[in-house]
């Protein structure tokens, strides 16, 4: 028979009473009324914020977007196949936020900042709200430093500055992504952190971009945020904001960042899908009334910060897809009105073999020459003028057979200048090479060559100047000006190479 010791029992009871924690945790819970198509309606979530994260019984996370008198409309950030009618939901009290750190560089992540490249977890000690307010007027300064894309047509005639927002717009398959990825490649060694956001694209297309960046060593300073076409609409809608939060982290740490949204048409479609399923009233083209605000609050986060905040910058290159060149559709007009200019890519030019297929006539940069170095300003003005005159003459020349010599010369010059703007993909040029190329064209050195010889000659000229006249590049990179000395070295180099080239071609 076991003897019961009363003092031992009383000690145990006393210990348990002392250890008893009277803390009460109050959890705000609700019940699922209806679920389907990536949307759930919840009853009983009393104190929930707009945009708050809610957690379902089986672990799926959702965002409360519609707060109505008798229920809450939630968009699901997962497939939600295990959610049932009547299952419980709890409010987390948090607005969507992501961890941020330097460790994200070189990684491929999803809209919730979880890695999807199979290379393990990413360590981060800080976090940022996905939706944070844009810098105010006092926090900014005007754009004055160039962000070189490596594409002659853009850097000379549609210059982009650090902190600018420049739209890349065009039909499908006109090389929009190629312009954006070339810009990333050109930031090598420029201390610019790049963020590429892929929204609603094929997984194979994203893999192709990532492979291209890895092969050329550009992933070292790049973060890829990807939500492919099979991702829930809520995640496709969130992806650009996640990218912006990561870029802001670096911007506020006095660094320069470049962010590419590829593309905002797909984000608008995902947002339209969510809004219609939440039964929000449709507007033009069935988009909800606040689709302008969707893009404006995203693009306003790009800025050039004031000297008090460390002069960091975030340059945005949003991409928008048009249908058969219609720039007057709803989303294109919205984004054009928000951004500081647009680069228009034309399917006709692309099919005619002019690549990058930039229509210089209707492309514009509202920052202009403030975002160019002096050397580029010196040569670009003449290029713009001559190309504009050429475009006018070309249209006129189609109806006239007998043209005077001056007109024929101008047309010949224009054709060679157009040839000079052609570039292969993934072959960005340094600003010194661009200045030299434009100078060669606008000063008539290409006029004696056949159109088919122009690109071959320019490639050889760049190599020749790099090896035999390195002082030209040194002067431009140190003074940022095409000085008289640099010009005489350049003239000498062009003439020497031209003689050699013509001799080679004769043989």
From Swiss-Prot:
Residues engaged in binding ATP: 170-177
Pfam families per record: ATP-synt_ab, ATP-synt_ab_C, ATP-synt_ab_N
InterPro entries: ATP_synth_asu-like_sf (IPR023366), ATP_synth_asu_C (IPR000793), ATP_synth_asu_C_sf (IPR038376), ATP_synth_F1_a_nt-bd_dom (IPR033732), ATP_synth_F1_asu (IPR005294), ATPase_a/bsu_AS (IPR020003), ATPase_F1/V1/A1_a/bsu_N (IPR004100), ATPase_F1/V1/A1_a/bsu_N_sf (IPR036121)
Compartment(s) of residence: Plastid, Chloroplast thylakoid membrane
GO annotations of cellular component type: chloroplast thylakoid membrane; proton-transporting ATP synthase complex
Catalytic reaction list: ATP + H2O + 4 H(+)(in) = ADP + phosphate + 5 H(+)(out)
Topological type in the membrane: Peripheral membrane protein
Assembly, per entry: F-type ATPases have 2 components, CF(1) - the catalytic core - and CF(0) - the membrane proton channel. CF(1) has five subunits: alpha(3), beta(3), gamma(1), delta(1), epsilon(1). CF(0) has four main subunits: a, b, b' and c.
Name of the featured protein: ATP synthase subunit alpha, chloroplastic
């Amino acid at each position: 028979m076991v003897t019961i010791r009363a003092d031992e029992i009383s000690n145990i009871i006393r210990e348990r009473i002392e250890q008893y924690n009277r803390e009460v945790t109050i959890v705000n819970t609700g019940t699922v009324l209806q679920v389907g198509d990536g949307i759930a309606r919840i009853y009983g979530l009393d104190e929930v914020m707009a945009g708050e994260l809610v957690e379902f019984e089986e672990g799926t996370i959702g965002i409360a977007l519609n707060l109505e008198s008798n229920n809450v409309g939630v968009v699901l950030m997962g497939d939600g196949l295990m959610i049932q009618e009547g299952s419980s939901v709890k409010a987390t009290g948090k607005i969507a936020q992501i961890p941020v750190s330097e460790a994200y560089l070189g990684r491929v992540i999803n809209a919730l900042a979880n890695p999807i490249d199979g290379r393990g977890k990413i360590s981060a000690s800080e976090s940022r709200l996905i939706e944070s307010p844009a810098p105010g007027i006092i926090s900014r300064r005007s754009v004055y430093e160039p962000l070189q894309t490596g594409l002659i047509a853009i850097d000379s005639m549609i210059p982009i500055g650090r902190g600018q927002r420049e739209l890349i717009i065009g039909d499908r398959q006109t090389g929009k992504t190629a312009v954006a990825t070339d810009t990333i490649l050109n930031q090598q060694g420029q201390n610019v952190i790049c963020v590429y956001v892929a929204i609603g694209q094929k997984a194979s297309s994203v893999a192709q971009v990532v492979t291209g960046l890895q092969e050329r060593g550009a992933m070292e300073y790049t973060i890829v945020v990807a939500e492919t076409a099979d991702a829930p609409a809520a995640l496709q809608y969130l992806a650009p904001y996640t990218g912006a939060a990561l870029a802001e982290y670096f911007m506020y740490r006095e660094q320069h960042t470049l962010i590419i949204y590829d593309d905002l048409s797909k984000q608008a479609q995902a947002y339209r899908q969510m809004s219609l399923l939440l039964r929000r009233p449709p507007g033009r083209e069935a988009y909800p009334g606040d689709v302008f605000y969707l893009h404006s609050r995203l693009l306003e986060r790009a800025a050039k910060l004031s000297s008090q905040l460390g002069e960091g910058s975030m340059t945005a290159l949003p991409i928008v897809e048009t249908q058969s060149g219609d720039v007057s559709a709803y989303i294109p007009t919205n984004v054009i009105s928000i951004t500081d200019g647009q680069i228009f890519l034309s399917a006709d030019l692309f099919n005619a073999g002019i690549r990058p297929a930039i229509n210089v006539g209707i492309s514009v940069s509202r920052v202009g020459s403030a975002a160019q170095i002096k050397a580029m300003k010196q040569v670009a003005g003449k290029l713009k003028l001559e190309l504009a005159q050429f475009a006018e003459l070309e249209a006129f020349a189609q109806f006239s057979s007998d043209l005077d010599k001056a007109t024929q010369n101008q047309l010949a010059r224009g054709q060679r200048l157009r040839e000079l703007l052609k570039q292969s993909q993934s072959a960005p040029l340094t600003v010194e090479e661009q200045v030299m190329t434009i100078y060669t064209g606008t000063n008539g050195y290409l006029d004696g060559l056949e159109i088919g010889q122009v690109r071959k000659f320019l490639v050889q000229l760049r190599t020749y100047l790099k090896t035999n006249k390195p002082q030209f590049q040194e002067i431009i990179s140190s003074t940022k000006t095409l000085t008289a000395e640099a010009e005489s070295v350049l003239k000498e180099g062009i003439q020497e190479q031209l003689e050699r080239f013509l001799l080679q071609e004769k043989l």
